[in-house]
Amino acid sequence: GQALYEQVVGKDKMNQPCRIYAPVGSHEDLLAYLVRRLLENGANTSFVNRLADDEAPIADIIADPVTEIEKLEQIPHPHIPLPSAIFAGRVNSQGAALWDDATRAGLMSGIENALAKPFEAHALIDGKPDLVGPLRRITSPHDRRMEIGQVWEADEKAVARAMESAAKAQMDWDLSGGTSRAAMLDKAAGLFEANTERFAALLVREAGKSLDNAIADLREAVDFLRYYAMQARAEFNGPMLLPGPTGERNELSLHGRGVFACISPWNFPLAIFTGQMAAALASGNSVVSKPAEQTPLIAFEAVRLMHEAGVPKSVLQLVPGDGARIGKVLLAHPALSGVAFTGSNETASIINRALAARDGAIPTLIAETGGMNAMIVDSSALPEQAVRDVLASAFDSAGQRCSAARLLFVQDDVAGRVIGMLKGAMAELKVGDPMEFATDVGPVIDEDARAGLEAHKARMRAEEKTIINLPLGADCSHGTFVAPAAFELSSIAALKREVFGPVLHVVRFAGDRVGDVCDALNATGYGLTLGLHTRIESTAAEVRRRVRVGNMYVNRNQIGAVVGAQPFGGEGLSGTGPKAGGPHYLHRFATERVCSTDTTASGGNAALMSL
């Protein structure tokens, strides 16, 4: 670089100003940086390296790399798929470059247009509006003075009619075949993406999601539709021939079980709501969907588009309203064949007991519940990377993810540094309106959630050590906001239950006791997600072997499972399985039938004559 500097700086040269910089810091901070720069500048293709090569033509050295790439006949590598084609058999969902001002401005303009008119939702019984039930205003969690729409909740009679109609329609839907059903799901995926701004508006204002979380929620819904459509074509499109002796033909086919009640949560009001009904529909079931009380507007828009995509209105019914009241009718109805549920462990247990107490066939229960999710950071981990991933895992979506980290186990040797770095990083989190791109943490869903979290924080302040508890600004005074907080616990026993919000609990552990950490996590009975930061392969192998957990993430955050790539679901108190977005999920919605035919009765096996 010195030779280049001498050619550029000075009045008798090119008279161009140059900046000289000298990184300052400790050995542990700067060594990695120095090695990286040495590797970059020492590479054969490096500008600095080639500049010192007397045999290298100047024209080659100063050539514009963009111009050189444009000369290539084929810029993409033929064996590296483009983002839209990374998943074989289906199109990837569309993302949005929110960091780009023009892209973000276009999205915001569409959101403003969508919010210009209040939204409405109501029960859809055979596609017809049911306006008999109670009317309720829907306000935004970031500002309860902002009314964004209203919902007519279904009454008990409407729920019963929905179940009866869905039962009558199910057989024809099952007989329509996987290819026909898949075409409708694929069409629905396209309609969802065509309504990105409308969904984003609702996800931000009704559910309190940030802009990037809103886009991610929509993308996951689209991925569910296309993934289950792909599976329906492959596995629900006719019988599979099984092996057997000559003179006999054995076939196995998959069929819908009947009517599925799909009961979804508010934290992923589009993705999980869509995933449940898409899986049930793809498998040949009819569906009665019951969305969370907090997010009926999003559910209504989704069902409306599913009907527009061709799903028969009698096959897909919508019954928004109070969970206990509607759930009682759904679970007791004789037409019920299965329940897909995502929510609390307590509610899942109530559903399970209600199903077991029924007379007749016991409906199938597919439940995904919560978890005492932890991240383990040992002394070999990169502190900056670990803290970055802890922030995302614990505080993204205001900690309102099933997969969010509730516990951070950090090794004694590095605990002081990691906790100090975490405290500093948390101090920079911006809490506020989720519509603002700079916001890191938005509101929690409602006043009940806020009150419960504040009560827990008060107990932690009284009984444990406070690391940091962020203040809330005046702009948060009209919403249900909870300031992010971190507490250091004396042991995991101090955490009695899952805390569903932006609160992190830190526990130190000795370097030779990682096995004890695994045992403590298993002892909770939960098994949803686990994060691990280590550069020691044997540690990763031991933790993977010992911890009973559905989804484990190594040296990354533990949120944002991708459909088809990271099937999601837990074990133990965290759910029944199988995993949503995985190859075995649809099978749980289906029943198997085998037909064995004696071919000798019609003349034997003619295929033998052509051997």
Question: What is each residue range found by the language model?
Answer:
Residues 17-24, 30, 35-58, 141-151, ...:
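Conserved C-terminal structural/oligomerization subdomain of aldehyde/semialdehyde dehydrogenase
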Residues 132-139, 144-236:
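Glycine-rich loop-to-alpha-helix module at the N-terminal edge of alpha/beta enzyme cores
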Residues 39, 44, 49-150, 168:
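Hydrophobic face of amphipathic alpha-helices that form TPR/SEL1-like repeat modules
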Residues 145, 166, 181, 203, ...:
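Residue-level signal for inorganic ion chemistry
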Residues 204, 234-387, 577:
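Rossmann-like NAD(P) dinucleotide-binding subdomain of oxidoreductase/dehydrogenase enzymes
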Residues 305-311, 332-333, 338, 346-490, ...:
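ALDH superfamily catalytic-core signature
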Residues 1-10, 16, 412-413, 418-419:
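Long hydrophobic segments that form regular secondary structure
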Residues 286-288, 467, 551:
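A short hydrophobic/small-residue beta-strand
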